[in-house]
Curated annotation (Swiss-Prot):
PANTHER family: 26S PROTEASOME NON-ATPASE REGULATORY SUBUNIT 7, EUKARYOTIC TRANSLATION INITIATION FACTOR 3 SUBUNIT F-RELATED. Ubiquitous with highest expression in flowers. Disruption phenotype: Slightly dwarfish, with long and narrow rosette leaves. Exhibits a delayed flowering time. Mutant displays enhanced susceptibility to the fungal pathogen G.cichoracearum. One of its GO terms (cellular component) is plasma membrane. The modification N-acetylmethionine is found at M1. Component of the 19S regulatory particle (RP/PA700) lid subcomplex of the 26S proteasome. The 26S proteasome is composed of a core protease (CP), known as the 20S proteasome, capped at one or both ends by the 19S regulatory particle (RP/PA700). The RP/PA700 complex is composed of at least 17 different subunits in two subcomplexes, the base and the lid, which form the portions proximal and distal to the 20S proteolytic core, respectively. This is 26S proteasome non-ATPase regulatory subunit 7 homolog A. Belongs to the peptidase M67A family. It comes from Arabidopsis thaliana (Mouse-ear cress). Keywords: Acetylation, Immunity, Innate immunity, Proteasome. GO terms for biological process: innate immune response; leaf morphogenesis.
């Protein structure tokens, strides 16, 4: 049965969530203090502002949270602690408001909608940001969601809330950029060449593409097996992606790829050859310099101690 989203929690749709580095550092510190080396997750409150569909997350704080691993419906979040912390943060910066909550997931869980409903009492349309504190691949370790109402086509069943994914990005003010650069100063390796950086970036992009393709394949397999309902909207998006793929059977395109690959291999070969010649040249110079030092040491007069 087809499902159509007909009503959202707020009149304005969230288009993007911007997370600041201070928030990421605070969440990682929270995880390391509470749930490191365990399967538990940590939960906290996100502070910031929202304007024209963009949620700007500038600060956060942790809240006590417990849940039953066997029964997801059993969980506890300390309301009093949250309200006390928010009042203290409000004194420091009155412009920051509750915009949602965070979790170290690393994926959505069954009781997330219940926790999300709790934050509806503090903000009309809260966002959920899941932070992967132990990412397996490079990239942005954040995923953001907001809730919408969903009803069946025949309207015989009650509407239910579901999460909708929204794009995220990492951004910082000038002061934050200076602090982040200071923290990463000892991490950066200045000896890495630009070519190596570009190759690493392309490799990361290919790994990300491979992961997305695997997710698509897994989703389609679940739909075929009947474990997930058929969603025409997702299939339309997939069809649009496949329609954008180029026809790789064209002779001109195959020839162009071959020429491009041969040119790149030639550049790599010449680079390796030049690097070897330079290394050999430096080795010869080092040998000659050592011989000159040895000759200079041998030509020095040896001091003979005077006899009494």
């Amino acid at each position: 049965m087809d499902v159509i989203k007909t009503q959202q929690i707020s009149a304005r749709t969230i288009e993007k969530v911007v997370v600041h580095p201070l928030v990421l550092l605070s969440i990682v510190d929270h995880y390391n203090r509470v749930a490191k080396d365990s399967s538990k997750r940590v939960v906290g409150v996100l502070l910031g502002s929202s304007s024209r569909g963009v949620v700007d997350v500038t600060n956060s704080y942790a809240v006590p949270f417990e849940e039953d691993d066997k029964d997801p419906s059993i969980w506890f979040l300390d309301h009093n602690y949250h309200e006390s912390m928010f009042h203290m943060f409000k004194r420091i910066n009155a412009k920051e408001h509750v915009v949602g909550w965070y979790s170290t997931g690393p994926k959505l869980r069954e009781n997330d909608l219940d926790v999300h409903a709790l934050f509806n009492g503090y903000v009309p349309n809260p966002v959920l940001v899941i932070i992967d504190v132990q990412p397996k691949e490079l990239g942005i370790p954040t995923k953001a969601y907001y809730a919408v109402e969903e009803v069946k086509e025949n309207a015989t069943q009650k509407s239910q809330k579901v999460f909708v994914h929204v794009s995220t990005e990492i951004a910082a003010h000038e002061v934050e950029e200076i602090g982040v650069e200071h923290l990463l100063r000892d991490v950066k390796d200045t000896t890495i060449s630009t070519l190596a950086t570009e190759v690493t970036a392309k490799l990361t992009a290919l790994k990300g593409l491979d992961a997305r393709l695997r997710e698509i394949r897994s989703y389609l397999d679940l739909v075929i097996e009947g474990k997930l309902p058929l969603n025409h909207e997702i299939l339309y998006h997939l069809q649009d992606v496949f329609n954008l793929l180029p026809n790789l059977n064209v002779n001109e395109l195959v020839k162009a790829f071959s020429v491009k690959t041969n040119d790149m291999m030639l550049v790599i070969y010449l680079s390796s050859l030049i690097r070897s010649v330079i290394a050999l040249h430096n080795l010869i110079n080092n040998k000659l310099l050592n011989k000159e030092h040895e000759k200079a040491e041998d030509s020095k007069p040896v001091a003979i101690p005077a006899t009494s």
